[in-house]
Amino acid sequence: MSGHSKWASIKHSKGKADKQRSKVFSKLSKEISVAAKLGDKDPAMNPRLRSAIQAAKSANMPKDNIERAIAKSSVNSETNYENLRYEGFGPDKIAVIVEALTDNKNRTASNVRSIFVKSGGNLGTQGSASHNFNQLGIIKIDKKEISDEQIFELAIESGADECISNDEFHEIQCPMSEIYNVKKNLEKTIANFISTEIEWVPLNSVDVEKDKVEAALEFLETLEDDDDVQSVYSNINFKNN
């Protein structure tokens, strides 16, 4: 659960602070349980579950927690979760997309709307903000796995559109429909991945006035802290602040 390096899409990393670890594990466990419930409990046969487990391992979630989350999918068979998306605009009119996984959409909608209103922003309708983004398949690989030169060539050969490297990881971009095919090709050479996710990538990032950056950050962090919210994306650009 991390940010998009090139376009400054905000998808804040969870779990870096000890005080957030419990909340992070709770959200990861929910995703694992839902993925296991909706598909095969064998990660090899369930791409969503495989990605959820990969994210959990990247967050240093204990193996026992992962196994309990998978087992929980059978115990809580009567609990139905929905994937929901909310769109709107926050401080300084930054475009925001919120992805949630909830068993009570009325509660989640009320909470998300309240956060938008308190920030001085507004929650819009479907499509009101998402036209500012593209959905892409994003595969992240630790720099220790492979060099910049090697990963670029491998990514293109594997069917990716682009590969961007920074100080920490390689980010491979591809059409969302091709993400698992691209990863399957990469797995012939690479064993360990940081994450494999569909992300909302801004078409253009926008600058926020310096005196509003703190408010924008607080708004995004408050959204992400909601128990039902899994991911938060924005087109805000922090590089010039």
From Swiss-Prot:
GO cellular component: cytoplasm
Keyword DNA repair: no
Broad class of the protein's primary localization: cytoplasm
GO molecular function: DNA binding
Keywords: Cytoplasm, DNA-binding, Transcription, Transcription regulation
KW Cytoplasm (keyword) present: yes
Annotated GO biological process: regulation of DNA-templated transcription
Superkingdom of this protein's organism: Bacteria
Signal peptide: none
Pfam family for this entry, one: TACO1_YebC_N
InterPro entries, sorted: Integrase-like_N (IPR017856), TACO1_YebC-like_2nd/3rd_dom (IPR048300), TACO1_YebC_N (IPR049083), Transcrip_reg_TACO1-like (IPR002876), Transcrip_reg_TACO1-like_dom3 (IPR026564), YebC-like (IPR029072)
Region (Disordered): 1-24
Compartments (UniProt record): Cytoplasm
Similarity section: Belongs to the TACO1 family.
Protein name stated in the entry: Probable transcriptional regulatory protein SAR11_0592
